[in-house]
Curated annotation (Swiss-Prot):
Source species of the chain: Borreliella burgdorferi (strain ATCC 35210 / DSM 4680 / CIP 102532 / B31)
Keyword Ribosomal protein: yes
GO terms assigned for molecular function: rRNA binding; structural constituent of ribosome
This protein's GO CC annotations: ribonucleoprotein complex; ribosome
Record key words, sorted: Ribonucleoprotein, Ribosomal protein, RNA-binding, rRNA-binding
BP term (GO), one: translation
Subunit structure: Part of the 50S ribosomal subunit.
Family to which the UniProt record says this protein belongs: Belongs to the universal ribosomal protein uL24 family.
The name this protein goes by in its record: Large ribosomal subunit protein uL24
Family annotation (CDD domains): KOW_RPL26 (cd06089)
Upper classification of the organism: Bacteria, Pseudomonadati, Spirochaetota, Spirochaetia, Spirochaetales
Gene responsible for this protein: rplX
NCBIfam families noted in UniProt: rplX_bact (TIGR01079)
């Protein structure tokens, strides 16, 4: 699935336990259609001890969210993204109000 989202974009989460939260995209997996949003969809991960002296621990880590469950969020407005060409330059814009990104 093709996406117009980029790393660093602010997005609003549309479904799941963090529904309504806003965060920035940390990474995008285009093959699996997943994004990782900073400080959203946190899960606990158990790290085993590598040596007998070291202790195992539990850390909080961001889990991937499906691309269909996030929407671009700019200046209080969440909208779908569109692409148009202006002066032979590709421009991303919000479909709701035509605002350039």
């Amino acid at each position: 699935m093709k996406t117009k989202l980029k790393i660093g974009d602010s997005v609003k989460i549309l479904s799941g336990k963090d529904r309504g939260r806003i965060g920035k995209i940390a990474s995008i997996n285009r093959k699996k259609n997943k994004v990782i949003v900073e400080s959203c969809n946190m899960v606990k991960k158990v790290i085993k001890a590598r040596t007998p002296q070291e202790k195992g621990r539990i850390i909080d880590k961001e889990a991937a969210i499906d691309i269909s469950n996030v929407m671009i969020f700019v200046k209080g407005t969440s909208s779908r993204l569109g692409i148009r060409f202006e002066n032979n330059e590709k421009i991303r814009y919000l479909k709701k109000n035509g605002q350039r990104i």
